[in-house]
């Protein structure tokens, strides 16, 4: 038993780059800085967002993801992919938002939540402060949840020798052994089968235990997945106290299964609006899975349950390709060649568009209703007394659902992966496409359900899969709608490159123009005809 009166005298905690990985890449290949660095290759527009945050950047001499100028983002990805050789050097992310410079592993939280037991000693802790805009936080129920399990903690030692904890991650959320096989219902399409898994527990598994299942496995696959590369897709569920978040959140995850089955080092490619401050402190970036889910302020697991669809691969080439492509997308995103617009350029669409640009066919599910969008445009404008809100509604109704709804995207991706596994999918003819790589290298598909971490926040649920479900979760009394107002974060003009290409007009611009013509020409014409008719009838 550790000496509960002892204090840490050895070099604990350790630097976040001293052990483990960031996705596929050894953490030791990176160095820790903040965004004010002047000797790193990360572009200035990216560094600006992290001037007061700890980030990891590739060490000198390592190839970093780049970008092309005067070209649309996904045209850039397609052109880069077409010219990329099979033996290309790894292209490291331009940055990883590690959030905290130090970590400890295999720790236990004391029942009073005041210290961590590790390596035979005791490390006094305190928790990072709650962000003022954050409406809930870690509480006594969180301590009870963490006190029963081994933990990885990210944070930093302060001047008083206390470890200021930013992240607590349960190490028993792992893939140490191949998960038990879970047969899919034979009479269900893959999309519906996955939806059933996500919804089979109350609240979408928010209050349930961590669970992992094998959904498909190649017969020749070995039963030891340790060290295997993975390409995963994460969907976070709907929040219980934010009526803008019933559809959840989507991201692509890359990495490898650690020798002890750990998954916390996987890299989550999180896209989030850059032009507003997040009430939870979220900044769009590649981020370790443990911090993405379990940061005390921004961790998605504090707000809702989460689900991971994991493709276990025989080779890492598909994973490396996707991560390198996402590095280019991040560069274009930070410099505002790719601008966040929630209906059409969001966490889901950016991820799905990247997969499609690399040659993985994610079939479209179609829009919610083009007819309703066009016919309802003047109604929305009159009801909301805002043409801008009518445009927003139009764009939500006309975008393909796999580019808008996280649950629709992961369901469709699951179906696509199963088709690749059976040889029935349509892929690009070139062997170098992502679809062909996955068809050749896919060894298994696993499903992970990660519960919500108890805190003062309301329980979340499985994500809404379409607009009808989303509307059903909204309060009928509009005065009870919960929305968190956040301040804007304007992009500095000094960082805006002069080669940026104009964004394509939103689809709603055509609707606004068409209805404007109707109002300016059509209605006056009808009035004139009616007047002539009345005069003639006298």
What name fits each language-model region?
Residues 159-160, 165, 521-522, 530-533:
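Sequence termini and other peripheral, non-core segments
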Residues 2-9, 13, 295-388:
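Active-site nucleophile-His-acid catalytic modules used for acyl/amide transfer and hydrolysis
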Residues 44, 247-250, 376:
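Residues that flank catalytic or metal-binding motifs in active/ligand-binding sites
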Residues 189-193, 211-306, 425, 440, ...:
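Glycine-rich catalytic cores of cysteine/serine-nucleophile enzymes that process amide/ester linkages
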Residues 357, 361-363, 379-488:
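Solvent-exposed soluble domains appended to multi-pass membrane proteins
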Residues 375, 527-535:
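Short, aromatic- and cysteine-enriched interfacial helices/patches
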Residues 1, 535-538:
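Gram-negative bacterial Sec-dependent N-terminal signal peptides
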Residues 5-213:
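Long, charge-dense tracts
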């Amino acid at each position: 038993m550790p000496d509960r009166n002892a204090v840490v005298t050895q070099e604990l905690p350790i630097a976040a780059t001293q052990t483990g990985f960031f996705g596929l890449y050894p953490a030791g290949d990176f160095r820790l800085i903040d965004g004010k660095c002047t000797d790193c290759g990360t572009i200035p527009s990216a560094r600006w967002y992290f001037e007061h945050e700890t980030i990891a950047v590739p060490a000198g001499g390592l190839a970093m993801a780049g970008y092309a100028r005067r070209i649309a983002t996904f045209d850039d990805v397609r052109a880069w992919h077409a010219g990329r050789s099979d033996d290309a050097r790894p292209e490291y992310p331009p940055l990883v938002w590690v959030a905290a410079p130090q970590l400890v592993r295999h720790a236990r939280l004391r029942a009073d939540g005041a210290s961590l037991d590790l390596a035979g000693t005791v490390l006094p802790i305190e928790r990072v402060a709650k962000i003022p805009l954050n409406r809930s936080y870690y509480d006594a129920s969180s301590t009870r949840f963490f006190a029963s399990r081994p933990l990885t903690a990210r944070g930093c030692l302060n001047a008083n020798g206390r470890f200021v904890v930013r992240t607590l991650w349960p190490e028993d959320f792992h893939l140490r052994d191949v998960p038990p096989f879970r047969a899919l219902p034979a009479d269900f399409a893959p999309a519906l089968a996955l939806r059933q898994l996500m919804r089979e527990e109350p609240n979408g598994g928010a209050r349930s235990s961590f669970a992992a299942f094998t959904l498909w496995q190649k017969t020749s696959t070995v039963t030891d997945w340790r060290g295997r590369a993975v390409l995963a897709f994460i969907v976070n569920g709907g929040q219980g106290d934010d009526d803008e978040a019933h559809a959840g959140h989507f991201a692509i995850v890359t990495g490898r299964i650690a020798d002890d089955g750990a998954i916390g080092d996987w890299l989550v490619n999180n896209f989030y609006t850059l032009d507003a401050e997040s009430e939870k402190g979220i900044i769009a970036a590649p981020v370790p899975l443990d911090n993405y889910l379990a940061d005390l302020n921004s961790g998605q697991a504090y707000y809702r349950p989460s689900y991971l669809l994991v493709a276990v691969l025989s080779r890492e080439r598909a994973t490396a390709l996707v991560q390198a492509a996402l590095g280019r997308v991040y560069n274009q995103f930070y410099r505002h060649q790719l601008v966040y617009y929630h209906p059409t350029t969001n966490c889901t669409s950016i991820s799905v568009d990247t997969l499609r640009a690399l040659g993985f066919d994610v079939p479209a599910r179609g829009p919610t209703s083009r007819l309703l969008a066009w016919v309802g445009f003047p109604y929305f404008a009159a009801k909301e007394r805002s043409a801008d809100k009518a445009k927003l509604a139009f764009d939500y109704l006309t975008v393909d659902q796999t580019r808008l709804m996280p649950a629709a995207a992961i369901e469709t991706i699951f179906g696509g992966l199963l088709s690749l596994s059976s040889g029935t999918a349509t892929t690009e003819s070139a062997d170098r496409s992502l679809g062909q790589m996955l068809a050749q290298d896919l060894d298994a598909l696993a499903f992970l359900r990660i519960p919500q971490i108890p805190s003062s926040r309301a329980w979340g649920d499985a994500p809404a899969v379409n607009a009808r479900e989303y509307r059903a979760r909204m309060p009928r009394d509009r005065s009870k709608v919960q929305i968190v107002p956040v301040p804007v974060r304007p992009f500095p003009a000094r960082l805006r490159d002069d080669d940026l290409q104009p964004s394509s007009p939103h689809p709603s611009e055509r609707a606004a123009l068409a209805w404007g013509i109707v109002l300016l020409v059509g209605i006056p014409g009808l009035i004139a005809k009616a007047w002539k008719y009345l005069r003639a009838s006298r």
